[in-house]
């Protein structure tokens, strides 16, 4: 269930209504009156929830869906358990997105007053000119908020934080002693898109961002909120300027990421990992605790704990050095020769 501090519940809908909105069809017309109240990921959908299956590799996950509703392709209907109502479509993700928009809406600042009267500011909070704070937001003692900062509805900011000019924070829970530098964007929608019958559609991002105590986010860096769950930056981790952390990433404690690092969605990073500048990490990987990723490395496979990887594609440092030396020898020891 999306966090009600950040998302408004628009009320239940019948399966018949969702089928009409999404372009799907009911596998069993008798289920058209069944009510759905919220969306959920496939692995945790229960009674009252609607989810989707688009990846055939996850067919085994259908077994736990008794009482839930699922968008899926017609050829996968036979794999669903009894008691799971089905909405059949060739575009499960896009159809689910239409249902999600019907059931949930992001809470937005109404704009009537820059600082909403329903926000809570503890003693010693300093607000510079031009700050916008949404309904239900809470800011802890001693926090300093720079000019032009936007803090969205429901956001919780801890004590003794420093928020730089023009930073934007939404859909987020921020710990104590966190520094967010100028222009950083925390909690915007992660990149989710799927093909639909009339073209590509955006997938709703219904999760949050959690910044634990002592985190630093550099200028103009972005940390996207999760698709369903949380994007988490662990305690005392330090992120440089111009870094992008995608949705559902879990970054451990005491990690460092130099400028232009990009960490793709749902990657899990252990404690004490260091990323050199311009390092790129593909999605759904695991970077083990204490690993080091070299500058400009492109990581397409999970990295074991404590290892140092670099290169394109990234591989263990000793292997990269050996292969680079071999290439140099083959090129005559002086690289590739140009024209004399």
UniProtKB/Swiss-Prot annotation:
Record-level GO BP terms: lipid A biosynthetic process
Catalytic activity field: a UDP-3-O-[(3R)-3-hydroxyacyl]-alpha-D-glucosamine + a (3R)-hydroxyacyl-[ACP] = a UDP-2-N,3-O-bis[(3R)-3-hydroxyacyl]-alpha-D-glucosamine + holo-[ACP] + H(+)
InterPro entries linked: Hexapep, Hexapep_transf_CS, LpxD, Trimer_LpxA-like_sf, UDP_GlcNAc_AcTrfase_non-rep
A GO term from the CC aspect: membrane
Gene Ontology molecular function, alphabetical: N-acyltransferase activity
Pathway(s) of this molecule: Bacterial outer membrane biogenesis; LPS lipid A biosynthesis
The keyword Magnesium is assigned to this record: no
Gene3D superfamilies: Hexapeptide repeat proteins, MurE/MurF, N-terminal domain
CDD domains, alphabetized: LbH_LpxD
Keyword Repeat applies: yes
UniProt function note: Catalyzes the N-acylation of UDP-3-O-acylglucosamine using 3-hydroxyacyl-ACP as the acyl donor. Is involved in the biosynthesis of lipid A, a phosphorylated glycolipid that anchors the lipopolysaccharide to the outer membrane of the cell.
Subunit organization: Homotrimer.
NCBIfam families in the record: lipid_A_lpxD, PRK00892.1
Record protein name field: UDP-3-O-acylglucosamine N-acyltransferase
Organism: Caulobacter sp. (strain K31)
């Amino acid at each position: 269930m999306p966090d009600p501090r950040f998302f408004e519940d628009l009320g239940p809908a019948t399966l018949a209504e969702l089928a009409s909105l999404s372009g799907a069809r009911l596998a069993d017309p008798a289920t058209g009156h069944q009510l759905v109240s919220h969306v959920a990921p496939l692995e945790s959908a229960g009674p009252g929830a609607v989810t989707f299956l688009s990846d055939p590799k996850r067919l085994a996950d259908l077994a736990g869906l008794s009482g839930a509703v699922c968008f899926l392709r017609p050829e996968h209907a036979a794999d669903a358990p009894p008691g799971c109502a089905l909405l059949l479509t060739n575009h499960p993700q896009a159809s689910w997105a239409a249902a999600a928009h019907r059931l949930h809406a992001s809470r937005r600042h109404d704009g009537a007053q820059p600082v909403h009267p329903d926000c809570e500011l503890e003693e010693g909070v300093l607000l510079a000119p031009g700050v916008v704070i949404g309904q239900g937001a809470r800011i802890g003692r001693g926090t300093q908020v720079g000019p032009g900062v936007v803090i969205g509805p429901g956001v919780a900011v801890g004590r003794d934080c420093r928020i730089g000019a023009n930073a934007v924070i939404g859909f987020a829970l921020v710990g104590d002693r966190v520094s967010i530098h100028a222009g950083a964007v925390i909690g915007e929608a992660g990149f989710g898109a799927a093909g639909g019958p009339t073209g590509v559609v955006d997938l709703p991002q219904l999760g949050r961002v959690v910044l634990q105590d002592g985190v630093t986010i550099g200028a103009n860096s972005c940390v996207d909120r999760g698709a369903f769950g949380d994007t988490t930056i662990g305690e005392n981790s330090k992120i440089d300027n111009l870094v992008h952390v995608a949705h559902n990433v879990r970054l451990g404690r005491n990690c460092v990421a130099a400028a232009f690092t990009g960490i793709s969605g749902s990657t899990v990073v252990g404690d004490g990992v260091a990323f050199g500048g311009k390092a790129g990490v593909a999605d759904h990987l695991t970077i083990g605790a204490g690993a080091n990723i070299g500058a400009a490395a492109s990581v397409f496979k999970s990295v074991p704990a404590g290892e140092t990887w670099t290169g394109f594609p990234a591989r263990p440092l000793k292997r990269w050095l050996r292969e680079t030396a071999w290439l140099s020898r083959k090129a005559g020891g002086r690289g590739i020769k140009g024209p004399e």
